[in-house]
Design a protein with these regions (language model features):
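Aromatic-rich, solvent-exposed beta-strand/loop patch
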Residues: 164-173, 252-258
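Short proline/glycine-enriched turn/loop motifs at strand-loop junctions of beta-rich domains
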Residues: 57-63, 156-163
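The feature marks proteins involved in alpha-glucan
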Residues: 1-49, 78-157, 180-258
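Acidic/polar N-terminal loop/beta-strand segments that form early-domain functional surfaces
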Residues: 57-59, 69, 100, 168, ...
Length: 258
């Protein structure tokens, strides 16, 4: 007699999520006010008892879902543009966010799943005041980080309570893009995937006195024409043609050269 297969079939479709642990009132308040030093500790994906918690801050969105292997799982709204949920996973997976707005939908990489895009040597030299190429370490630098194209935003603001990136496509509201403090260096950093050349931006500074200011980037490679004051994401495409001269410049003693 043939044996009957009584095994339970593998479930198909997205894994259902559960309610995420609430943020503390202090963390939530500082995050929404733009005065949190480490938004990456609150947003993105993190292990918690029972799985992985996903949390996103998208103040203009109608809904946000986590996309894993092509399957969407909706996050619950916490109010104030925060969306969250816990998925029963053993480890943080590769994922994207599907964000629905009144005017359309988009699937994007989560800025808060990336490690810092500025190295320890840069931070050490900035902290000691000995960095000789600050224009490469600070400002808006288009790059590919962890395999994803985007732009690294960095600014030196040692006395700020918080810093956010405000752009033309967020209507100069920096709420959804708070930056993280990189310790005693005084540098704030955020990698924004998918943001490229031509994007207009400013830094939204939250001072220690509770005031907020929109500031142009002091290390900007390009700026708008007056009376507009925004900085513009720009990469250098200049190609030097002095390789032959550089190769032979040591052939002549410096005091004998013209």
């Amino acid at each position: 007699m043939a044996l009957k297969d009584t095994s339970i079939p593998e479930p198909s479709g997205p894994v259902p999520g559960t309610t995420a642990p609430a943020l503390s009132p202090e963390d939530r308040g500082r995050l929404l006010a733009g005065a949190h030093h480490d938004p990456h500790a609150l947003l993105g994906a993190h292990p918690v008892p029972g799985g992985i918690v996903f949390r996103a801050l998208r103040p203009f969105a109608r809904s946000v879902s986590v996309v894993i292997d092509g399957q969407r799982t909706a996050l619950a709204s916490e109010g104030d543009g925060l969306f969250s949920g816990v998925l029963p996973l053993a480890a943080i997976p590769a994922y994207t966010l599907h964000v629905a707005y009144d005017g359309g939908e988009q699937e994007v990489h989560d800025p808060y799943r990336f490690l810092p895009a500025l190295g320890e040597l840069d931070l050490h030299l900035i902290r000691e005041g000995r960095h000789e190429q600050l224009w490469q370490a600070l400002g808006a630098q288009p790059m590919t980080h962890e395999g994803v194209p985007g732009t690294r935003f960095t600014v030196w603001a040692p006395n700020a309570q918080g810093v956010r990136v405000a752009t033309d496509f967020t209507y100069w509201d920096g709420t959804q893009f708070p930056m993280r403090s990189l310790g005693a260096s005084g540098v704030w950093e955020l990698f924004l995937p998918g943001v490229g050349e031509g994007t207009a931006y400013k830094f939204e500074i939250h001072s220690r006195y509770g005031h907020r200011f929109l500031k142009a980037d002091p290390m900007a490679r390009r700026c708008e024409e007056p009376p507009n004051t925004a900085s513009i994401v720009t990469a250098s495409h200049y190609e030097w043609g002095d390789a032959e001269w550089m190769a032979h410049r040591a052939d002549t003693p410096v005091h004998e050269a013209p």
